[in-house]
């Protein structure tokens, strides 16, 4: 999808529902069910649902992705490491898209983008196996021309630009030099990837307050946002939280 007329076409929103499962797993119970949360997000207008199936199963479970595949009406994007176990699960579930991400034991959240200049064989094999089963593949990368070139060389046609540095620099409403520089890095990365005929997504740490500038960047067609939406949902409800984010993106 190419957005030549920004007044007509808005940036798409994929809602990451991991932290609905985080609440459930805090008590090792059945509620809240991320499957129900996904349905609410879709009914509120979300264009897709994202989940991260981690090796340690700290929140999303195999059961969740199997049921989500049967119930989601929009687009199911599963974030995962490029391991044999995870790729096997993806080939069983057949999501619309897999986003390959780095994964470190004990990390609170994903700490950076894939290093596409290393572990190339594992990433390439994962991409080939997924694409041969008609599963779209995106690589989560830092806003670096080197990483984008490397991802293209590995066979990727879609990237998700890591917005963590921008997000960390824009936690308040006060403009900062670091925030402006990080925003420009994302803009340049999106422009470069687009020039290579790649589809460009973005996400990580985005909030209602800082997402507007990212959504205005040409060629970024979709944003993956989770924690801030789920945090707001705890106060105003999930439907309202999704509607509020969609309003910002418009």
Regions found by a protein language model. Name each.
Residues 45-47, 71-73, 92-98, 132, ...:
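Glycine-enriched alpha-helix->loop->beta-strand junction motifs that scaffold or abut catalytic
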Residues 5-85, 89-95, 153, 178-181, ...:
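Conserved N-terminal beta1-alpha1 strand-loop-helix module at the mouth
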Residues 100-107, 158-171, 219-238:
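Glycine-rich phosphate-binding active-site loops on the catalytic face of alpha/beta enzymes
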Residues 11-17, 49-51, 76-78, 98-100, ...:
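Hydrophobic faces of well-ordered beta-strands that scaffold small-molecule active sites
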Residues 58-84, 118-138, 178-202, 245-249:
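Alpha-helix-loop-beta-strand connector modules within alpha/beta enzyme cores
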Residues 136-192:
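Histidine/lysine/aspartate-rich catalytic loop segments that bind and position anionic ligands
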Residues 69, 172-179, 231-250:
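C-terminal helical cap(s) of enzyme catalytic domains, especially alpha/beta-barrels
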Residues 84-93, 144-154, 202, 206-220:
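Catalytic cores of alpha/beta
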């Amino acid at each position: 999808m190419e957005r030549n007329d920004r007044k007509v076409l808005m940036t798409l929103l994929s809602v990451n529902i991991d932290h609905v499962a985080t609440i459930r797993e805090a008590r090792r119970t059945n509620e809240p069910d991320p499957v129900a949360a996904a349905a609410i997000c879709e009914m509120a207008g979300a264009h897709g649902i994202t989940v991260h199936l981690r090796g340690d199963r700290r929140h999303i479970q195999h059961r969740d992705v199997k049921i989500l595949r049967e119930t989601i009406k929009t687009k199911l994007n599963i974030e995962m490491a490029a391991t044999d176990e995870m790729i096997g699960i993806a080939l069983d579930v057949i999501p619309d898209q897999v986003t390959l991400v780095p994964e470190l034991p004990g990390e609170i959240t994903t700490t950076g983008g894939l290093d596409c200049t290393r572990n190339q064989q594992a990433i390439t094999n994962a991409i080939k196996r997924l694409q041969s089963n008609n599963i779209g593949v995106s690589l989560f990368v830092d806003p670096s021309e080197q990483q984008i070139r490397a991802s293209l060389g590995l066979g990727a046609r879609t990237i998700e630009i890591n917005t963590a540095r921008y997000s960390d620099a824009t936690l308040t409403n006060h403009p900062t030099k670091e925030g402006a520089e990080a925003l420009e890095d994302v803009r340049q990365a999106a422009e470069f990837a687009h020039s290579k005929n790649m589809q460009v997504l973005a996400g990580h740490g985005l909030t209602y307050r800082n997402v507007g500038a990212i959504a205005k960047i040409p060629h970024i067609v979709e944003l993956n946002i989770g924690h801030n939406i789920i945090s707001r949902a705890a106060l105003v409800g999930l439907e309202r939280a999704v509607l509020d984010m969609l309003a910002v993106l418009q």
